[in-house]
Amino acid sequence: MAAPNRDPPGYRYAAAMVPTGSLLSTIEVASHRRLFDFFSRVRSDANSLYDVEFDALLGSYCNTLSLVRFLELGLSVACVCTKFPELAYMNEGRVQFEVHQPLIARDGPHPIEQPTHNYMTKIIDRRALNAAFSLATEAIALLTGEALDGTGIGAHRQLRAIQQLARNVQAVLGAFERGTADQMLHVLLEKAPPLALLLPMQRYLDNGRLATRVARATLVAELKRSFCETSFFLGKAGHRREAVEAWLVDLTTATQPSVAVPRLTHADTRGRPVDGVLVTTAPIKQRLLQSFLKVEDTEADVPVTYGEMVLNGANLVTALVMGKAVRSLDDVGRHLLEMQEEQLDLNRQTLDELESAPQTTRVRADLVSIGEKLVFLEALEKRIYAATNVPYPLVGAMDLTFVLPLGLFNPVMERFAAHAGDLVPAPGHPDPRAFPPRQLFFWGKDRQVLRLSLEHAIGTVCHPSLMNVDAAVGGLNRDPVEAANPYGAYVAAPAGPAADMQQLFLNAWGQRLAHGRVRWVAEGQMTPEQFMQPDNANLALELHPAFDFFVGVADVELPGGDVPPAGPGEIQATWRVVNGNLPLALCPAAFRDARGLELGVGRHAMAPATIAAVRGAFDDRNYPAVFYLLQAAIHGSEHVFCALARLVVQCITSYWNNTRCAAFVNDYSLVSYVVTYLGGDLPEECMAVYRDLVAHVEALAQLVDDFTLTGPELGGQAQAELNHLMRDPALLPPLVWDCDALMRRAALDRHRDCRVSAGGHDPVYAAACNVATADFNRNDGQLLHNTQARAADAADDRPHRGADWTVHHKIYYYVMVPAFSRGRCCTAGVRFDRVYATLQNMVVPEIAPGEECPSDPVTDPAHPLHPANLVANTVNAMFHNGRVVVDGPAMLTLQVLAHNMAERTTALLCSAAPDAGANTASTTNMRIFDGALHAGILLMAPQHLDHTIQNGDYFYPLPVHALFAGADHVANAPNFPPALRDLSRQVPLVPPALGANYFSSIRQPVVQHVRESAAGENALTYALMAGYFKISPVALHHQLKTGLHPGFGFTVVRQDRFVTENVLFSERASEAYFLGQLQVARHETGGGVNFTLTQPRANVDLGVGYTAVVATATVRNPVTDMGNLPQNFYLGRGAPPLLDNAAAVYLRNAVVAGNRLGPAQPVPVFGCAQVPRRAGMDHGQDAVCEFIATPVSTDVNYFRRPCNPRGRAAGGVYAGDKEGDVTALMYDHGQSDPSRAFAATANPWASQRFSYGDLLYNGAYHLNGASPVLSPCFKFFTSADIAAKHRCLERLIVETGSAVSTATAASDVQFKRPPGCRELVEDPCGLFQEAYPLTCASDPALLRSARNGEAHARETHFAQYLVYDASPLKGLAL
């Protein structure tokens, strides 16, 4: 047995140093002494004696002092602390409250109400605190005196061991002190809903609204508005004292008082009770004290009391009592450990002490007045959490997603300037603010002005995923598709002579055309607003900027028969080839004209005289018909033209003198020959017209090179051929005289699968044809290839001229001619037998040798045009009727036609696969079909009203393309069905044997643009050239790198993280805090003893409503740089690659080389490429910008308020209660967008199922590696995530509403923070399915005006736009 010894005088040294003078300090001193006195009494080897008493006293020591320290904190205001020794044995605890519902006595016929008592049951939430320390074996020996040898060194070592034990115990005590505060702070945060949620919910219920769909929608709108207004309010308020005070009043009055009425609570020195506690961070506390709040008192009277949960063994009645005073450690040992008295005596003494005067002490406190409440202002950041590894719970993080509109185009009513003198360009320069915007300016972190341009989207669109539409086609064809009018979606194989092709088409398709609606024509006449309407049945097929989706004929290989077979339809997709084929509603004519105006700056422009002369010729209904005959007879032959030069000069000069218009401008071959050979023979003003036309064609051709980067050939084609349609040999000019274009086309790579059908036959090239060999009824594939003067032994199977000859022809016919004719001209076949017969039928009087050639057709009978020589059906009469003066020698040159003739017009149908820059697994089987006429001509202004002209005898209208299908020409052809006359003015009647709209390289939007354009000829030519740039990953790389607007804009999405500082308010005595018996576990080790201290704790809310609330006060700092780092899909996105390996490697290297997110080298064999680490970082973690393709016609106002980046609202908060409403809300565009009832969507390329944006960012497809970690767009597109957020928000609203409503005992209502509050605070954009606009502008001058805070800063200036910040950060300076 151990014998007690006297207390050594040094054992109480540490306790004696504790300052005294208050009750709390007295308790601490007594506890120290009692613990250390133990070591003076015990001297024994019996571990049992040592264990029992030491463990008990150690537990009591930590238990008591941790509670004592906690009572000094402001958090204790919100707590009712209760000792519950049996807490460790409790399996489930419940507390029942009885709440009386207040009544109002009223007069009148109202029924008399009886008192109502509501019973509420709450479950006790169990927790625990743990700490540990260890004592070495040597230290234990010194503490017990076993190792003392009577020397001074031994005594010193014992003293050091005691001090080390004191430090260990003090560390455990500190851990329990801080742990108690941290645990209670977490308890209060767990039951504190955000202020942004609680305020709308209170208004929602206070107004007596019911939980209907209307009320729910109103509530959500109020919730979103409240979140933006109340978040970071302290940071946004600046020095506005009234605003901050009102915000604090809202914060402190949003909660409900506790049902507990403690006998004693915190009070100021004058006895006024404290109403609650406001816990925040040290900077916010300091700012509130300095600038906004009045300190009512600097000290508070704190109760040193606790309650005790007493369990009577007889009846197990649970009672909650208050007022047990902690006076000494002996009381703790008697009451808490039950070591000396029976339970009955303890209960009796507890009840007796309830009547004694409770003990209080005075502590340092900041008591402030907020409204009518006295609040304990507390900041625990430095006091509790300093130098610990535990983060301060009131310092959180919030992810905000921002949306920026890039490259959009203002509608006509928004393109204005407030004052004519503002933001004017330099003198003599055009105003660049009238051009379509290609960049966006905004502020990043530290108010740094950053720029986003279309070039930044290279990492997104210059990727093979742009061409991946297999999933879309497969998904659309899951359900049966109703057959539609196949016109424009069906290509027939040409058969028979060209002269019969148009009539056969009208006969076979007449019924379908008369009764069927042609979708692609109707779409061209829609405004952007009409196109986006829910009643647009075809909106569901507008899914991708690079592809047309349409209802085609199922199971038919094209080209097919004359008419499509009857049967079901199927959704098909074709590559749009060029950006000009984007629907006019999504890429308006005004945008195209503005882009053309921009491209024309600094480049060649045709003179006004040239424009007037050429336009006059195209509009001249009295254009001499004989010119068409001469054009057909020359048939593009340089040799024939030179032979007829005298006649041509006289024709051009005579027409110029009569009308000041230029002749033969409908044939580029003749225009080029005139410039080459007739320079000195024509009047200078007239010659200038032709030279100007050729110069402009060459300038347009140069435009392609200006927007093409240098690079290797891919798939056997130069980069310019992959970038621009006019340079692509696969496209033929609509009218060809020679076979150069066909030969170059046939020489393309085999993967292009270029095929040509010449009237249903394979083409055969013939060198020459004369009157002896000509067969005008030929019906085979022979094509004439002798348009250039050449040697007799020249080969017939290779081109005669350079590639530019064909390119210039295409530019002239597809660009210049539409700009002048505006779609009113028409291609036509030639009846060469009649043409030659008429041209050879002439009367030319013989002129005697030595006589001069007669020059006066009126008086000189020897002149061919003298009335005496005007015989019917002769060419003389035709020249006379056209007022063209020619002489006899000139007419005699027509005799040369017998030696070089053309036989017939041949209809050509050409097909080709996509080029190497667009050829993927999805597109490799797609074919583009284009028609052309060999040996055809172009008819200009219609002349059907002039009965002296019978063009039908020589030509037959045969539209080869919608650009050359003038309604007056087609409808006034012989045997045209009268029922189709009105239709012909709307629908271009092009035979399916010459192509179809959806399979053509140039489609209806280009035709409609030509008709609607208000631009002049110069701007329109550049606009059309810009529209012929291709839409493919390789082509877009050239365009975006060189600064060309691709015809569509982008919605830029960026997510940033912000470190936030929060404020917590809790009502007085709103939480019951149960403290169980602290248990000490002892674990023997080889080197000593480990002690683990565990104390079970529990808590339960004491309110019938929310008794705590939290608010985000300000931003401490942004974690991300708020920058402009563009996404790069080559870092990990998977997609079917380009089939041409060289093109795939070139594109990858080109994109990665210019991207800050380029993968590090070497690329790993497995897994994603890694992002290289840069040498330094200044503004924070890089925030990645992702790009969603968006039509340029999208209303910029959509982005001026919080919006869904998809272009359509999502999330079930808007949805009804029926099954499937959530999905219909997202994808059923037959219903309007709930957030914008006047439209179905703002971006059909992203909001619809299987759309381009959906395929890119929807993780459900697992196609392109969309990641919730790496992609800020993922949460807006993935339906599973959206549904989860919907359920979260729905549950948040339902549970918040039920919690603050009348509660019964039917359920255990805890008044905890509702599920979803974490998402509301940390990721509100995902919860609301909305991103916030930032202050940004397409013009830096507009951005500066917003920064300077101009009173009436305009939001638009011509084509430029400014978007103001509408996020919760509005008003913060970051």
From Swiss-Prot:
Keyword Ligase included in the entry's annotation: no
Pfam families in UniProt: Herpes_MCP (PF03122)
Keywords noted in UniProt: Capsid protein, Host nucleus, T=16 icosahedral capsid protein, Virion
Gene Ontology annotations for the cellular component aspect, listed alphabetically: host cell nucleus; T=16 icosahedral viral capsid
Localization annotation: Virion; Host nucleus
Gene Ontology molecular function: any one: structural molecule activity
SUPFAM superfamilies tied to this protein: Major capsid protein VP5 (SSF103417)
Family note: Belongs to the herpesviridae major capsid protein family.
Self-association and partners: Homomultimer. Makes the hexons and eleven out of twelve pentons. Interacts with triplex proteins 1/TRX1 and 2/TRX2; adjacent capsomers are linked together in groups of three by triplexes, heterotrimeric complexes composed of one molecule of TRX1 and two molecules of TRX2. Interacts with scaffold protein; this interaction allows efficient MCP transport to the host nucleus. Interacts with capsid vertex component 2/CVC2. Interacts with the small capsomere-interacting protein/SCP.
Function field: Self-assembles to form an icosahedral capsid with a T=16 symmetry, about 200 nm in diameter, and consisting of 150 hexons and 12 pentons (total of 162 capsomers). Hexons form the edges and faces of the capsid and are each composed of six MCP molecules. In contrast, one penton is found at each of the 12 vertices. Eleven of the pentons are MCP pentamers, while the last vertex is occupied by the portal complex.
Protein name as catalogued: Major capsid protein
Record organism: Human herpesvirus 1 (strain 17)
Organism taxonomic ancestry: Viruses, Duplodnaviria, Heunggongvirae, Peploviricota, Herviviricetes
Gene symbol of the encoding locus: MCP
